[in-house]
Swiss-Prot record:
Pfam families: NmrA. Pathway: Aromatic compound metabolism; phenylpropanoid biosynthesis. This is Eugenol synthase 1. The gene is EGS1. Its EC number is 1.1.1.318. Induction: Triggered by EOBI in flowers.
Length: 308
């Protein structure tokens, strides 16, 4: 069997980054994480770095904004996975420049882990947020860097514990607010599964220069179907309040940052159905649960059962 690629994760202490690092180490890849020295002294992040150390991950000190340290780190690996957060998406041009200079990278995974930004029809301000990811994609392609874009749609941990109810900390037990008519389908993926599928794609020729869509059939659901699963789990029918699209668009226009961004992303997802309103063609994409049927992914029903 071929040797497993050495992987560098940039942004590994972030929300989805932790799961990617864990999956990489678990799969037996020599795993490296780029961290700033200041990160280690941060109480919460320091604990994460410590857990990486304990699982055999190599910590490399460096910074997205320090070109030398970036090139030095990249030269030690075969694959770079970026999981940087929203504020640093545009600065991934610095990673692209370092990859070009290093000249040894077999594949780059930019920070995606959401909707396929080439397929969305979002309104502002989500439109501008997605546009940054589009610019990074085009920059990677223009430089001829081999890539995989991971479209993992909705993080279960963001959406399912509250069933996307505004301002809620628990799932609804009496009434539920539904965007639009509740028929547009979205996809909900548990974060460990996102990490697992991402790492499986690293050395897979089938995912090279393609988008890897994580769209398991049991987790591809309309909001009405999602509510029906929850109702079954709690043995109760909820009162349903449907918010028409024109009201949602008004709310987006009048809400402050970051509420307006969240509302606009939810509009794209749950009203427009931007995660599911296209067919995955072999020319540009592959679907994770089809490629890796051995992965026992967490279903939405299993996930929600912990809250029932």
């Amino acid at each position: 069997m071929a040797e497993k690629s050495k992987i560098l994760i940039i942004g590994g202490t972030g929300y989805i980054g932790k799961f990617v690092v864990e999956a990489s180490a678990k799969a037996g890849h020599p795993t490296f994480v780029l961290v700033r020295e200041s990160t280690v002294s941060d109480p919460a992040k320091g604990k994460i770095v410590e857990s990486f150390n304990n699982s055999g991950v190599t910590i490399l000190y460096g910074d997205l904004y320090d070109h030398e340290s970036l090139v030095k780190a990249i030269k030690q690996v075969d694959v770079v996975i970026s999981t940087v957060g929203q504020m640093q998406l545009a600065d991934q041009t610095k990673i692209i420049a370092a990859i070009k200079e290093a000249g040894n990278i077999k594949r780059f995974f930019p920070s995606e882990f959401g909707m396929d930004v080439d397929k969305v029809n979002a309104v502002e301000p989500a439109k501008s947020t997605f546009a940054i990811k589009v610019q990074i994609r085009r920059a990677i392609e223009a430089e001829g860097i081999p890539y995989t874009y991971v479209s993992s749609n909705c993080f279960a941990g963001y959406f399912l514990p509250t069933l996307v109810q505004p301002g809620a900390t628990d799932p609804p037990r009496d009434k539920v607010i539904i965007s639009g008519d509740g028929n547009a389908k979205a996809v909900f993926n548990e974060e460990h599964d996102i990490g697992t599928y991402t790492i499986k794609a690293v050395d897979d020729p089938r995912t090279l220069n393609k988008t890897l869509y994580i769209k398991p059939p049991k987790n591809t659901l309309s909001f009405n179907e999602l509510v029906a699963i929850w109702e079954k789990l709690i043995g109760k029918t909820l009162e349903k309040i449907y918010i028409p699209e024109e009201q949602i668009l008004k709310d987006i226009a009048t809400s402050p940052i970051p509420i307006n961004i969240i509302l606009a992303i939810n509009h794209s997802t749950f009203v427009k159905g931007d995660q599911t309103n296209f067919v995955i063609e072999p020319s540009f994409g592959v679907e994770a649960s089809e490629l890796y049927p051995d992965v026992k992914y967490t279903t939405v029903e299993e996930y929600l059962s912990h809250f029932a």
